[in-house]
Design a protein with these regions (language model features):
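Conserved thiamine diphosphate
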Residues: 1-136, 142-145, 161
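Short helix-loop-beta junction
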Residues: 146-164
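Glycine/proline-rich, positively charged
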Residues: 168
Length: 168
């Protein structure tokens, strides 16, 4: 489908189920551009919730970001807020290579400013969420919330923390 001009989006109920098709993701989608000498592209997005969502069995609570991030040819996206989620998803859909788009189910109820208009956020670019001078916290996804809490506590003690969100 991707090699005929389509840009499919595969949605998993949970990324744990991606393991059923991991061979096709890692050995086909991720490698087709390199195996074809650049003749073929594979613009596909695999998206769904990752990691713990609370009150789910251990088989539905695993985080596979590092597995996919260590696969040449795949791009991995894990947004930390609604604004980034929209802009990064639009970029993922437009990308000519396969993108793993993982969302924290714990954040599905989060609210934030999201413009109705068109915008994208480039893949592969981290975001400095907070400037700081004493120490830097680098994280992604739902754990960014914990980084803010830690930074707020330290700021009360006069320690200014920089927060970097990897995003992709």
């Amino acid at each position: 489908s991707t090699m005929t001009g389509n840009r499919p989006i595969v949605e998993y109920m949970t990324f744990n189920f991606s393991l059923v098709g991991i061979d096709q993701i890692i050995n086909n989608a991720a490698k087709i551009r390199q195996m074809s000498g650049g003749q073929f592209k594979c613009p596909i997005v695999f998206r769904g919730p990752t990691a713990s969502a609370g009150q789910l069995a251990a088989t539905h609570s695993q985080a596979f970001e590092s597995w996919f991030a260590n696969t040449p040819g795949l791009k991995v996206v894990v947004p930390s807020n609604p604004y980034d989620a929209k802009g990064l998803l639009k970029s993922a859909i437009r990308d000519d290579d396969p993108v793993i788009f993982m969302e924290s189910e714990q954040m599905y109820g989060d609210k934030g400013e999201v413009p109705e208009g068109e915008y994208t956020i480039p893949l592969g670019v981290a975001d400095i969420k907070r400037e700081g001078t004493a120490v830097t916290i680098v994280s992604f996804g739902t754990i960014i919330k914990e980084a803010y809490k830690a930074a707020d506590e330290l700021e009360n003690e006069g320690i200014y923390v920089e927060i970097i969100d990897l995003r992709t």
